[in-house]
Amino acid sequence: MGLVTVITSGKGGAGKSTVSVGLGCTLAKNGKRVLLIDGDAGLRSLDAMLGVDKELVFDISDIVNGNCEPIKAIYSCEEYTGLNNLFLLPAPALEKHTIHPDLMKQLVPILSRYYDHVIIDCPAGIGKGFISAVAAADRALVISTPDPICIRDSDKVRQLLEERGIRQQRLVINRFSFESFRKMQHYQDIDTIIDETGIRLIAVLPDDIHLQTNPAKAVVNHSRS
């Protein structure tokens, strides 16, 4: 059974989807079979980022409602990324079709039997979309930009994840620039950010325009260079 990781952040624009796609591509490049699940009903984006948006017929809501078999709602991302072991399960087009947490708990473990990793891209905030996305997760990556509001929200997310039994959490500081960090003068150093969120740091990602605008291509092309 594959490991289920939810990618989350309390604040919109922190880069959850970028990290989700980048992580999925990296794992797939390393030979892992990966399923990306877009958890942002009404505002899905992974389909466009992975070049399958024109192919979509079914999504995760069609599986839980019995409209199709899971295989029909899971799309290969090989044509765009060149990775034949990377797949996407899209979110519903409408927010009202957000999957109930209990149904996520039933569906995701079944799907995870066929993959080494399942990565769930969580919507921003801590509403019903968040509760749905984290319901079946084994662990979480909390994405934060190095600004006070996002960092404060990350601490709140940490607490909510712990309340739901997800204690294996790691912090990713995204869009980091030493120059901007020094100019802001909000924090003495990165250790201060770690202390404020209460989450162990796993990565600091640079403020890279190529990575932010096209993470799939950035990751794949980097491996070939």
Give the residues covered by each predicted segment:
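C-terminal lobe/tail of nucleotide-utilizing enzymes
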Residues: 163-225
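P-loop/Walker-type NTP enzyme "switch/lid" segment
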Residues: 39-113, 211-221
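Conserved C-terminal guanine-recognition region of P-loop GTPase G domains, centered on the G4
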Residues: 152-166
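Glycine-rich phosphate-binding loop used to anchor ATP phosphates in small-molecule kinases
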Residues: 111-129
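Conserved nucleotide-binding/hydrolysis micro-motifs of P-loop NTPases
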Residues: 41-43, 94-95, 147-149, 176-181, ...
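Inter-motif core of Ras-like GTPase G domains
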Residues: 127-148
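Walker A/P-loop NTP-binding active-site region of P-loop NTPases
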Residues: 4-69, 117
